[in-house]
């Protein structure tokens, strides 16, 4: 009997059964993979996106798979829409939320001297301000759940230079520090906060870059694993950080990049043995 109880406890450490989650930007790419990963582990998930048509297409696929997913349209760069989103989530989940994944984000690639004030404001509001404000709004719901977890989807561009734009890298670097601050401030409320930094991942956002075969080959050559990552290789880490099994992991910035961020210069022709 004791063994059965221990086995049951072990299984619950690796399950999200009965938990609730909000994932922003969940209709494609990493966000879509995160929605599916959390739902497969038993969570009830609400997700949002700007494109209603794409959101409904994804919803039909999730329903066909038997996932417990609901959706709403939201542009996270809008403060009013963020507040409306959290009201929806609070109503759906009876004022309690276990998981918040701040995934929605965007990138404008330009030389620094070509950025406009509008570019700066848009990137800041979409990437950083939305993560900050949604975390603020979600705090009472996460606290009420008794077991809360926030994951901020940052970028490898937050920890090393990647020439995709200085403002983008700055927003993501600030997200990492936000995660550290909230992890310490909200630990007493039983809320964990971590940031995940994807490297080059095969997503709709990156597809425009990878159409350039020369660029793609250059990227693959600098990644130790020799390939671009897949969205589900990011979502698996996100899901782990939300599990009871990861209860002691908080305030961390974790790269999912095939070793890109730690790679120096590899001498291809130099024999190592």
UniProtKB/Swiss-Prot annotation:
Its EC number is 1.1.1.206, 1.1.1.236. GO terms for molecular function: tropine dehydrogenase activity; tropinone reductase activity. InterPro entries: NAD(P)-bd_dom_sf (IPR036291), Sc_DH/Rdtase_CS (IPR020904), SDR_fam (IPR002347), TR (IPR045000). The active site is at residue 168. NADP(+) binds at residues 22-46. Pfam families: adh_short_C2. It catalyses: tropine + NADP(+) = tropinone + NADPH + H(+); pseudotropine + NADP(+) = tropinone + NADPH + H(+). Optimum pH is 8.0. The pH has no influence on the tropine to pseudotropine product ratio. It is an enzyme of class 1 (oxidoreductase). It comes from the Eukaryota. Substrate binds at residue 155. Keywords: NADP, Oxidoreductase. PANTHER family: NADP-DEPENDENT MANNITOL DEHYDROGENASE, TROPINONE REDUCTASE. Belongs to the short-chain dehydrogenases/reductases (SDR) family. SDR65C subfamily. The hydroxyphenyl ring arrangement of Tyr-209 determines the tropinone orientation and the formation of either tropine or pseudotropine. Oxidoreductase having both tropinone reductase I and II activities. Involved in the tropane alkaloids calystegines and cochlearine biosynthesis. Can use tropinone and nortropinone as substrates and produces both tropine and pseudotropine. Able to oxidize pseudotropine in the reverse reaction. This is Tropinone reductase. It comes from Cochlearia officinalis. The gene is TR.
């Amino acid at each position: 009997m004791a063994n059965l109880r221990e086995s049951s406890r072990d299984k619950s450490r690796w399950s999200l059964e009965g938990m609730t989650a909000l994932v922003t930007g969940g209709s494609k790419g990493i966000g879509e993979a995160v929605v599916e990963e959390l739902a497969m582990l038993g969570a009830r998930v609400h997700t949002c996106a700007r494109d209603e048509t794409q959101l409904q297409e994804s919803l039909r696929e999730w329903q066909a798979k038997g996932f417990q997913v609901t959706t709403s349209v939201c542009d996270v760069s809008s403060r009013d829409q963020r507040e409306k989103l959290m009201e929806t989530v609070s109503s759906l989940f009876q004022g309690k939320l276990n998981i918040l994944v701040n995934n929605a984000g965007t990138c404008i690639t330009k030389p620094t001297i070509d950025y406009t004030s509008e570019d700066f404001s848009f990137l800041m509001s979409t990437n950083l301000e939305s993560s900050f404000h949604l975390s603020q709004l979600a705090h009472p719901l996460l606290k009420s759940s008794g077991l809360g977890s926030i994951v901020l989807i940052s970028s490898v561009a937050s920890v090393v230079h990647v020439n995709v734009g200085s403002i983008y890298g700055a927003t993501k670097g600030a997200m990492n520090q936000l995660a550290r601050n909230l992890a310490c401030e909200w630990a007493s409320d039983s809320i964990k906060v971590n940031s995940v930094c994807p490297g080059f991942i095969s997503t709709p956002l990156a597809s425009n870059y990878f159409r350039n075969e020369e660029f793609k080959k250059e990227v693959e050559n600098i990644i130790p694993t020799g390939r671009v990552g897949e969205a589900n290789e990011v979502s698996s880490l996100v899901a782990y950080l939300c599990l009871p099994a990861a209860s002691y992991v908080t305030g961390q910035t974790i790269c999912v990049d095939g070793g890109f961020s730690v790679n120096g210069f590899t001498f291809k022709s130099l024999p190592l043995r």
